[in-house]
């Protein structure tokens, strides 16, 4: 069973690599090597890196040697682990956060992967501005697009929903809960972000394809596409006053770089490599671009470079003479979100077990906060804690807590909380590790947390809701899979990514089933926690991230 669509460009980029001579690695046929490359790209590279040097996941080079600060050395590698041990790890997962692949890959594929990762990593080709230009498709020039909204849909309450394994995006009308349109996009769209105007949806696929969708047509229409590289995760527009939607930035995992485009046509303008030194002073050949966000304080983007731990503030006022401020934080930067004041961006340095906070006004690191294992905020959640004032919350992939960090506020009534700022003020207990996303809304008194990566079905298929008025109370568990009314399936149906509607009174959860199983979007009333609606449709296949236009446009969380 192989996951299907992977864009031809991304695949040919990876498959173009020749077979190298291997010492000590088990024999493989050419066909097995091709299968290994495809599965590695689709399933493994995100955590372990194309060059397999490790980040969220472990180093998977055939042989590695580490020298500690005290001069002692440690050696290891996939060759040392051998095929049998690797098959076990891939099949059953590990306590360190690696999920079990025995319900995703066949036995033969697990065996192929166990042998493939004992080979020297294949290095895919680079991707230049010329390659980007060649991939650029302007399907509808800006002056030929509608001059006003041509439909009657309340665009602010539209949800863009990733249909992960189909290479498609569903646009659902949040008012009527009807599917408005399902569009082709890149493979396994990672995130959708909105234009400052709320008219356009930008999506980026894992295969590096950016799709620009115009919501003003009778039905949503793709007006431009462009490739950023072979593997990407992030995209955002310029949002500062006077620059709204003028530019778009996209970050790639491979090659490690970010690209700047025209915001309305996607015309490629510039590529900047992120290769360089880590905060520990070592050169890294694959420092991937993780989250990117448009600053509210200045005409800048916050670009988080995973492996180096460097946070770049990219000033977009003069693209030809680009100025960048590079802020040292901690290695393995991943996802993050704004604090309540939208002055500080908090980003997880996940495998360093830290949260880094950037002050976008001063352009400096505001804090580096130690947390429990592998924080994974998504965008996090902001609320006023009854005892500690404004806090930002993150869940953890690697531990059974939700961490609450006190954040600064210029409001007079919050002055008394200053002494707590940048401290972990509370850790809410969860039923286990494996959380990916937490969410709340300014109008809500609830904090929602999923647990899709927990190995227990009863946790992975449920969400937990905390009462913000009394955080010492145990959370309410909602069994999303059961509430969907769908029959139980062999593969886990992971309940993930709570997202509010525009009004802030409903929470939408993805019930992410196997590729051939019926999945669903399950909607709850935020006040009563009662089931409100289940959206099932043969087109809703492997739904994951959901992005409400208004909340994404205004960073409401
Ligand atoms: Fe994500 C955000 C990277 C796996 C769903 N994910 C992000 C961001 C990064 C990232 C860098 C922040 C983007 C930004 O804000 O600019 N994700 C990665 C990986 O490297 C990783 C671990 C492995 C991979 O191969 O991609 C990974 N992510 C997943 C999944 O398996 C998820 C659960 C399902 C899916 O669709 O692939 C998933 N990631 C998401 C979602 C967001 C996200 C829904 C956006 C959260 C938000 O609310 O903004």
Language-model-derived ranges and their functions:
Residues 55, 69-70, 99, 168-171:
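Short, solvent-exposed loop/turn elements at domain surfaces
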Residues 26-37, 53-91:
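Gly/Gly-Pro-rich "capping" loops immediately C-terminal to redox-active cysteine motifs
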Residues 54-64, 88-120:
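Axial heme c-ligation environment in periplasmic c-type cytochrome domains
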Residues 41:
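Residues immediately within or flanking Cys/His clusters that coordinate Zn2+
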Residues 1-21:
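Gram-negative bacterial Sec-dependent N-terminal signal peptides
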């Amino acid at each position: 069973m192989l996951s299907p669509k992977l864009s031809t460009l991304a695949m040919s980029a990876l498959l173009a690599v020749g077979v190298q001579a291997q010492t000590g690695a088990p024999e493989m046929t050419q066909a097995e090597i091709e299968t290994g490359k495809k599965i590695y790209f689709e399933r493994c590279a995100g955590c372990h890196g194309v060059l397999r040097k490790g980040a969220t996941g472990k180093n998977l080079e055939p042989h590695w040697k580490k020298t500690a600060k005290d001069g002692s050395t440690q050696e290891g590698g996939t060759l040392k682990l051998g095929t049998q041990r690797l098959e076990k790890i891939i099949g059953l997962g590990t306590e360190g956060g690696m999920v079990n692949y025995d319900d995703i890959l066949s036995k033969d594929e697990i065996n192929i992967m166990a042998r493939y990762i004992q080979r020297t990593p294949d290095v895919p080709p680079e991707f230049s501005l010329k390659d980007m230009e060649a991939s650029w498709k302007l399907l509808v020039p800006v002056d030929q697009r509608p001059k006003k909204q041509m439909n009657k849909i309340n665009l602010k309450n539209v949800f863009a929903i990733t249909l992960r394994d189909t290479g498609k995006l569903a646009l659902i009308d949040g008012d009527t809960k009807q599917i408005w349109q399902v569009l082709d996009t890149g493979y396994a769209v990672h995130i959708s972000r909105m234009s400052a105007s709320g008219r356009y949806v930008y999506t980026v696929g894992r295969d590096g394809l950016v799709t620009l969708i115009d919501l003003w047509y009778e039905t949503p229409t793709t007006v431009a596409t462009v490739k950023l590289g072979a593997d990407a995760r992030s995209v955002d527009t310029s949002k500062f006053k006077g620059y709204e939607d003028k530019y778009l930035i996209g970050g790639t995992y491979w090659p490690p770089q970010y690209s700047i485009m025209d915001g309305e046509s996607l015309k490629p303008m510039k590529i900047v490599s992120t290769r360089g030194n880590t905060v520990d002073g070592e050169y890294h050949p694959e420092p991937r671009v993780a989250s990117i966000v448009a600053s509210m304080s200045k005409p800048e983007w916050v670009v988080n470079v995973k492996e180096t731990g460097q946070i770049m503030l990219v000033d977009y006022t003069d693209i030809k003479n680009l100025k960048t401020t590079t802020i040292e934080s901690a290695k393995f930067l991943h996802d993050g979100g704004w604090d309540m004041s939208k002055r500080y961006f908090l980003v997880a340095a996940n495998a360093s077990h830290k949260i880094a906070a950037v002050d976008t006004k001063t352009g400096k690191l505001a804090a580096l906060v130690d947390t429990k294992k592998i924080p994974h905020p998504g965008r996090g959640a902001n609320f006023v804690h009854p005892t500690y004032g404004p806090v930002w919350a993150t869940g953890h992939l690697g531990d059974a807590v939700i961490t609450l960090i006190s954040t600064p506020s210029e409001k007079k009534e919050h002055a008394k909380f200053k002494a707590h700022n940048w401290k972990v003020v509370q850790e809410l207990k969860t039923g286990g590790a494996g959380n990916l996303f937490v969410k709340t809304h300014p109008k809500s008194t609830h904090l929602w947390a999923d647990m899709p990566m927990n190995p227990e079905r009863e946790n992975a298929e449920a969400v937990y809701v905390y009462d913000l008025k009394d955080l010492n109370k145990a959370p309410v568990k909602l069994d999303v899979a059961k509430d969907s009314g769908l029959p139980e399936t062999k593969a886990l149906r992971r309940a993930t990514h709570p997202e509010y509607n525009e009004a802030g009174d409903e929470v939408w959860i993805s019930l992410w089933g196997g590729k051939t199983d019926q999945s669903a979007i399950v909607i709850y009333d935020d006040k009563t926690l009662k089931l409100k609606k289940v959206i099932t449709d043969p087109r809703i296949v492997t739904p994951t991230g959901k992005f409400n236009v208004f909340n994404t446009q205004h960073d409401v969380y």
